[in-house]
Amino acid sequence: MIEADRLMSAAAVTGEEVIDRAIRPKKLEDYIGQPHVLEQMEIFIQAAKMRGDALDHLLISGPPGLGKTTLANIVANEMGVNLRTTSGPVLEKAGDLAAMLTSLEPHDVLFIDEIHRLSPVVEEVLYPAMEDYQLDIMIGEGPAGRSIKIELPPFTLVGATTRAGSLTPPLRDRFGIVQRLEFYQTGDLQHIVSRSAVCLALNITEGGAREIARRARGTPRIANRLLRRVRDFAEVRAAGHITDDVAVSALNMLNVDTEGFDFMDRKLLLAIIDKFVGGPVGLDNLAAAIGEERETIEDVLEPFLIQQGFIQRTPRGRIATVHAYRHFGLEEHGGDPE
């Protein structure tokens, strides 16, 4: 299964950008959740503005869908500067990055999503740019080649990554501010759903927002996607009114259970329980058993299941916890509770 095809995928889906921009908060005061990150960023941004400096380079890590791009937009808005956006895989050559850097105005924000996927040659260009606001460009080749330096205006690089451990130490060390976004609590997600409903002019009750929030896997992107699908259901079956009962019926129809698990989550957990007697099972064997890439399991499926206590990672492999057995009404080792 392609990850982007999953309703419960935290990955961005083509076509959602327009709606996401409409409901995305623009200021720190509108950003819900992540209180420690917000408190720190408010201080860092205010201090930089008071000094008249560019904000220190910022690295934002965390699972997909938690608001890394939103936070980058907010940083630019709060600093009152332009935001230039790109991603690691897009910057194939050093010249691609050089072109973006030389187009920046003083204190602008350059946002690089998936920064862990930068090629080594592009990353080398970043080092002097981040540290000294300079570009080192080679003119010519061989013995006749020479290096010239191009001065850059002070700017802020905001890098986003789902795999902070994959960044090289020289790159990671050049970020003055490092923030990690965590999965959201249900209460914060409920506020996000309610806010998005207002932006989209939807009729939703507090109970309806809470039901969507508690099945959204701690992820705002999923919560907003579920809200749109529940809206469709409500418009056809409930005159557009999203109550808790309507939300429950819609989400059950979409095969999203009370824990926010979809088919792939249940497939992963049941593979560990049934095919590997609860584990431990190695990642490669587990990937083969469910027909998924190991990276998809590590980066997409596992984080939420581990955070919620349904899977444990051990030196010998993955283990299904007692919570996983109880979720499926099983005793440990896959026996029937009756």
Swiss-Prot record:
Binding positions (ATP): 23-24, 65, 68-70, 131-133, 174, 184, 221
Cystine pairings recorded for this chain: none
GO biological process: DNA recombination; DNA repair
GO terms of molecular function: ATP binding; ATP hydrolysis activity; four-way junction DNA binding; four-way junction helicase activity
Region feature (Head domain (RuvB-H)): 258-338
Region named Large ATPase domain (RuvB-L): 4-184
CDD domains: AAA
Amino-acid positions noted as binding DNA in the UniProt annotation, renumbered to this chain: 294, 313, 318
Keywords: ATP-binding, Cytoplasm, DNA damage, DNA recombination, DNA repair, DNA-binding, Hydrolase, Nucleotide-binding
Compartment(s) where it occurs, according to its Swiss-Prot or TrEMBL record: Cytoplasm
Catalytic activity: ATP + H2O = ADP + phosphate + H(+)
Small ATPAse domain (RuvB-S) as annotated region, ranges: 185-255
GO terms under cellular component: cytoplasm; Holliday junction resolvase complex
Subunit structure: Homohexamer. Forms an RuvA(8)-RuvB(12)-Holliday junction (HJ) complex. HJ DNA is sandwiched between 2 RuvA tetramers; dsDNA enters through RuvA and exits via RuvB. An RuvB hexamer assembles on each DNA strand where it exits the tetramer. Each RuvB hexamer is contacted by two RuvA subunits (via domain III) on 2 adjacent RuvB subunits; this complex drives branch migration. In the full resolvosome a probable DNA-RuvA(4)-RuvB(12)-RuvC(2) complex forms which resolves the HJ.
Entry text on domains: Has 3 domains, the large (RuvB-L) and small ATPase (RuvB-S) domains and the C-terminal head (RuvB-H) domain. The head domain binds DNA, while the ATPase domains jointly bind ATP, ADP or are empty depending on the state of the subunit in the translocation cycle. During a single DNA translocation step the structure of each domain remains the same, but their relative positions change.
Function of the molecule: The RuvA-RuvB-RuvC complex processes Holliday junction (HJ) DNA during genetic recombination and DNA repair, while the RuvA-RuvB complex plays an important role in the rescue of blocked DNA replication forks via replication fork reversal (RFR). RuvA specifically binds to HJ cruciform DNA, conferring on it an open structure. The RuvB hexamer acts as an ATP-dependent pump, pulling dsDNA into and through the RuvAB complex. RuvB forms 2 homohexamers on either side of HJ DNA bound by 1 or 2 RuvA tetramers; 4 subunits per hexamer contact DNA at a time.
NCBIfam families per record: PRK00080.1, ruvB
Record's protein name: Holliday junction branch migration complex subunit RuvB
Provenance organism: Sodalis glossinidius (strain morsitans)
